[in-house]
Regions:
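A short, N-terminal "cap"/entry segment at the start of jelly-roll beta-barrel domains
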Residues: 1-56, 128-191
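Short histidine-centered beta-strand/loop micro-motifs
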Residues: 26, 60-68, 85, 110-111, ...
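Short, conserved beta-strand element in jelly-roll/cupin
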Residues: 51-55, 66-83, 121-124, 184-188
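Catalytic cores of nucleotide-enabled group-transfer and carboxylate-activating enzymes in metabolic
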Residues: 36, 85, 101-102, 109
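Short, structured interface segments
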Residues: 117-129
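Short acidic-glycine-tyrosine-enriched beta hairpin
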Residues: 87-104
C-alpha cells in the first residue's frame, strides 16, 4: 500500500456505549431522536453512523425526498418501517432487514412502529436532503438499490479460527461498484 493511500485516511478509534448515549433532536424530523456513534469524527467526515429511534409514530411521514451523497445504508435494529422508493414501490423493513438507497433515489418513509430503531450509515458525513430530484446529478459511482431481508439461511459459517462466527453479506459490493462492502457477523456458538 502506498504512503499516500495510508496518510489521507482518518485513523481515530471511535466507540459509543448505549448506557452513556447522548440523544439529539435534529429538528427536521420531530418524531426521531438521533445518537451520533462517533464515526464522523473518527473518519474525518468521510462517513457518518447514527442510531435513530422513533419517539412518536403517530401519522408521521418524511415526505418525498432524496439525498445528495455517495452511500446510504439503513439496518433495522428494532420494530419496522414502511417506505415507498422510486423504482421499488412499497417496502417494509423489519428487525434484521436492511437497505442500500442509492444517491438521489426519491423515497418517503410512510409508517413506523412505536419501537422503531435503525442504524444509518452515510458517505460522506454531511448529507444534503432535497425535496425534488435534481435535473443534474453530477457524477456518482454506478449504484443500485438493494433490500436485504433477514434469512437465517443466508449466513455462512466462518473457517479456521473464526469457525464460531457466521457471516451474512448484504451484496453492497456489487450494488455500489465496489465502494462499500458490508456484512453482519454473529456467533454460532461458544467463542473459546
Amino acid at each position: 500500500m502506498s504512503d499516500s493511500a495510508t496518510t489521507d485516511r482518518a485513523t481515530d478509534f471511535a466507540f459509543d456505549c448505549l448506557a452513556d448515549a447522548v440523544w439529539h433532536d435534529k429538528g427536521q424530523r420531530s418524531f426521531f431522536r438521533y445518537r451520533d456513534l462517533g464515526v464522523t469524527k473518527a473518519s474525518g467526515g468521510r462517513m457518518r453512523a447514527e442510531h435513530i429511534q422513533c419517539v412518536n409514530s403517530d401519522n408521521s411521514t418524511t415526505g418525498w425526498h432524496c439525498h445528495d451523497l455517495d452511500f446510504q445504508f439503513v439496518y433495522v435494529v428494532k420494530g419496522h418501517v414502511a417506505f415507498t422508493a422510486e423504482g421499488w414501490g412499497d417496502v417494509v423493513l423489519k428487525k434484521g432487514d436492511c437497505a442500500h438507497i442509492p444517491p438521489f433515489t426519491m423515497h418517503d418513509e410512510t409508517a413506523f412502529s412505536p419501537d422503531f430503531e435503525v442504524i444509518e450509515i452515510t458517505m460522506p458525513a454531511e448529507v444534503t436532503t432535497l425535496t425534488e430530484k435534481p435535473t443534474s446529478r453530477g457524477t456518482r459511482p454506478d449504484s443500485k438499490m438493494i433490500v436485504d431481508y433477514l434469512d437465517d439461511d443466508s449466513f455462512v459459517r466462518g473457517e479456521g479460527p473464526r469457525s464460531f462466527l457466521e457471516y451474512r453479506d448484504f451484496g453492497f459490493g456489487d450494488a455500489t461498484s465496489g465502494l462499500v462492502q458490508a456484512q453482519v457477523v454473529r456467533t454460532n456458538g461458544p467463542c473459546d
